[in-house]
Design a protein with these regions (language model features):
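Phosphate/diphosphate ligand-binding glycine-rich loop within oxidoreductases
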Residues: 38-114, 129
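Phosphate-coordination loops involved in phosphoryl transfer and adenosine-cofactor binding
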Residues: 59, 133-136, 208, 217
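Rossmann-like dinucleotide-binding domain for NAD(H)/NADP(H)
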Residues: 84-85, 217-316
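Rossmann-like adenosine-cofactor binding region
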Residues: 36, 48-52, 167-261
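NAD(P)-binding Rossmann-fold cofactor-contacting core
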Residues: 155-173
């Protein structure tokens, strides 16, 4: 039996140490094919659809080294008896820290001021830096990472508003925020932070109409998924000055191609999808994904299986 790793950055020695006790061999291969393939380890750029079962009919599990899972046909694979497993909480601290860094950067004008000095300008500033304490942070989504962001932002004196269809007001309040409708959040926030998962319901959630509700001096920070925001509508808002700026850790195509329009947008900070990253979180992401696949191969319940496969049935 084989486990195929389609990400050439995956540390195979660690994957083998975790999975080979299950009686499998672990190999890097961009081709998923063979009756002996029982599991696949993938990454956000490695899409896995139901058609994989045409070439690997005995597939039991797909593990991704990411929290996001929009690259996996979760429901379709579950219907065919395949577990899809993601990793959770492996980079919560890193994403919170990076998002806070971007919030500080846009409000305090860190990148703008650096650019002025390099251009030979010292004073005056084209835009005044703003205080972080007392600013309104609007958080779109309420999960483990956004919970950490709310706690951290409220601790430094930000007024945190949260929009979520699923959150309870008491839970948001316990984290340090206030639950409000999305439209109210957009109209009030100094900074809107996108922190929700990408699903069919959230795809394009922040569209042209939503961006138009933002204050003209507001910033948008996205460390979640690019497709939650209408990319072209955001660009138009930045180019026309309808909002003050943006900080983006995610783009529609990654790595960014040379013709990526965001590269020329004014008042925009762009990051290489790095909010999740540290040496520690990198190791945890690979190990946790392999551990969950190992659980499936041992006949156990994975910790982070997203949809119970039909053929597995309910737990006893």
């Amino acid at each position: 039996m084989r486990v195929v790793v389609i990400d050439d950055t995956w540390p195979l020695d660690r994957a083998r140490a975790i999975l080979e006790p299950c009686g499998v061999t672990v190999e890097f291969n961009t081709e998923i094919a063979g009756d002996d393939v029982v599991a696949v380890l993938t990454y956000p750029g490695g899409k896995i659809g139901v058609d994989v079962l045409d070439a690997a009919p005995n597939l039991k599990a797909v593990g991704t080294c990411s929290t996001g899972f929009d690259h996996l046909a979760v429901d379709g694979l579950a219907e065919r008896g395949v577990w899809c497993c993601r990793v959770t909480h492996f980079c919560d601290v890193e994403v919170v820290d990076h998002t806070m860094a971007l919030i500080y950067a846009v409000l305090r004008g860190v990148v703008m001021l650096d650019g002025l000095v390099r251009e030979g300008t010292w004073w005056p500033y084209p835009r005044a830096p703003r205080p972080v304490r007392g600013s309104i942070l609007g958080v779109v989504g309420f999960g483990a990472i956004s919970h950490g962001l709310i706690t951290t932002a409220s601790a430094v004196g930000m007024d945190v508003r949260v929009a979520s269809e699923h959150a309870a007001a008491g839970d948001v309040a316990a984290a340090g925020g206030t639950l409000v409708p999305l439209d109210d959040l957009l109209g009030a926030a100094d900074v809107v932070a996108i922190m929700t998962s990408l699903t069919d319901r959230t795809r394009g959630l922040i569209d042209a109409a939503a961006i138009a509700k933002m204050r003209p001096d507001a910033y948008l920070v996205n460390t979640a998924r690019a497709a939650i925001v209408d990319h072209l509508a955001l660009g138009r808002a930045l180019e026309t000055g309808a909002i003050a700026g943006a900080a983006l850790d995610v783009l529609p195509v990654e790595p960014a191609p040379a013709d990526e329009p965001a590269l020329t947008w004014p008042n925009t900070i762009i990051q290489p999808h790095a909010a999740w990253y540290s040496a520690e979180s990198d190791r945890r992401s690979f190990d946790d994904a392999a551990e969950d696949v190992a659980r499936v191969l041992r006949g156990e319940e994975p910790l982070n299986g997203m949809t119970r496969p039909a053929e597995v049935g309910p737990l006893a």
